[in-house]
């Protein structure tokens, strides 16, 4: 868990569909603070396009160009109130853990959560990554005792691929028509420049009538 001053974080943009709050009497009475998790604040999420993704260990397949909805559920198990102020995240290398793409931090609320209160909201994420495997690492910004905390949750292994191209897609059909028209125009231009003169029939010279012999015969008869 990381602590940041509020002035060091720029929360920009909105990427949410719904924001709802509800009371949840179920608390973690056996919570014991640790160095990794000093506060009793639970963060879970679901990728709406892949139900039960939080509980599953399966690889989630995503396609470039699609938009996914990540619905977060944050429960405050602390005796003091906390405020949810933002959400971010990243796509990391699953082997090295190094960040490959950061998600722009987006503001939430701020919404004050009393003890045992739950806050739920949905974040929209457009997929535009190099086709390979990633770890989706969510990050929630919570304000507690004038300190900004960066809370994490379960990391999700995903694989990203490019969309399959079909020749019957409207864009492909239009491109095919343009290529055919261009090819037809090129053939016509070549024919008009070179082919017309090549296929044209050669002109034949007119035949001369033989008049000399007939005149000679007529002269002989007259004698």
Swiss-Prot record:
| Gene Ontology CC annotation, any one | endoplasmic reticulum membrane
Q: Which residue spans belong to the Cytoplasmic compartment? A: 193-223
Q: Does the record bear Endoplasmic reticulum in its keywords?
A: yes
Keyword flag Endoplasmic reticulum = yes
- Check the record and name the InterPro entries matching this protein: TRAP_alpha
Signal sequence annotation? 1-23
* Subcellular compartments: Endoplasmic reticulum membrane
Q: Which residues lie on this side of the membrane: Lumenal?
A: 24-171
What is the topology of this protein in the membrane according to its UniProt annotation? Single-pass type I membrane protein
Keyword annotations for this protein, in alphabetical order, are: Endoplasmic reticulum, Membrane, Signal, Transmembrane, Transmembrane helix
Chief location of this protein? endoplasmic reticulum
Coiled-coil residues are: none
Region labeled Disordered — which residues?
Answer: 204-223
- The membrane-spanning stretches of this chain are 172-192
What protein family does this chain belong to? Answer: Belongs to the IRC22 family.
Q: What does this protein do?
A: Is probably involved in a pathway contributing to genomic integrity.
Protein known as: Increased recombination centers protein 22
Taxonomic lineage is: Eukaryota, Fungi, Dikarya, Ascomycota, Saccharomycotina
